[in-house]
A protein has these predicted regions:
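Conserved alpha/beta-hydrolase catalytic His-Asp/Glu region
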Residues: 134-179
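Alpha/beta-hydrolase active-site loop signature
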Residues: 23, 48-52, 114
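Alpha/beta-hydrolase fold catalytic core
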Residues: 1-17, 38-41, 78-79
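Flexible "cap/lid" loop of the alpha/beta hydrolase fold
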Residues: 94-99, 103-137
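Structural cue for short, hydrophobic secondary-structure segments
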Residues: 18-21, 45
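Active-site glycine-rich loops that stabilize anionic/oxyanionic intermediates
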Residues: 13, 21-24, 87
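Serine-hydrolase catalytic-loop signature spanning alpha/beta hydrolases and amidase-signature enzymes
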Residues: 23-31, 43
Length: 179
């Protein structure tokens, strides 16, 4: 069983898990997590599967994402946690509330509702899929190649936070966009 990657901030006894949105990662919440840590929370910035530094898998559903969080909590011996789930993380949180309500002290679901949404990220995924890292050597080049697919610069910069150096001179994405 693989355990989700996390960055843990703070040393308090109240456990707060942050679940990021689609195409994001836990570190998107780093600034706010420091504030929450300063008021008594130990904050777990989790990268959900196929995102950030967590493992990649062809299995991907909200039930599976919720089971990943249960496994994470078991591994870290966490119980009665607070959870903030944003967008995709909110859907994960709703599933977690059904699968393991005893695990939750309280939760917040942000920026999403319990309904089925029309897929609307295909243009972003197409843009990310066409990035040829044999031709791209820096973030600016990646942004330029992504711009026909993602017009908004802020959105491009958000997506390109997923760039990382696989090895010196070789970039890659911390996203499993195939799934």
């Amino acid at each position: 069983m693989s355990i989700l990657y996390s960055n843990i901030i703070g040393e308090a006894e109240k456990e707060l898990i942050i679940l990021h949105g689609f195409l994001g990662m836990g570190d998107n919440w780093k600034t706010l997590s420091k504030k929450w840590a300063s008021v008594g929370f130990r904050v777990h910035l989790i990268d959900q599967r196929n995102h950030g530094r967590s493992f990649w898998s062809e299995s991907f559903s909200y039930k599976i994402l919720a089971e990943d969080v249960i496994n994470y909590c078991d591994h870290h011996k966490l119980s009665e946690v607070y959870i903030l789930g944003h967008s995709m993380g909110g859907k994960t949180t709703m599933n977690l509330a059904i699968l393991a309500p005893q695990l939750l002290k309280a939760f917040i679901v942000a920026d999403i509702a319990p309904k089925k949404y029309v897929p609307h990220h295909q243009q972003l995924l197409n843009g990310l899929a066409q990035l040829d890292f044999t031709l791209i050597s820096n973030r600016s080049e990646a942004s330029l190649r992504l711009s026909p697919f993602v017009k908004d610069e802020g959105t491009r910069m958000f997506l390109l936070r997923n760039l990382y150096w696989i090895s010196p001179g070789k970039l890659g994405l911390r996203l499993n966009i195939e799934v």
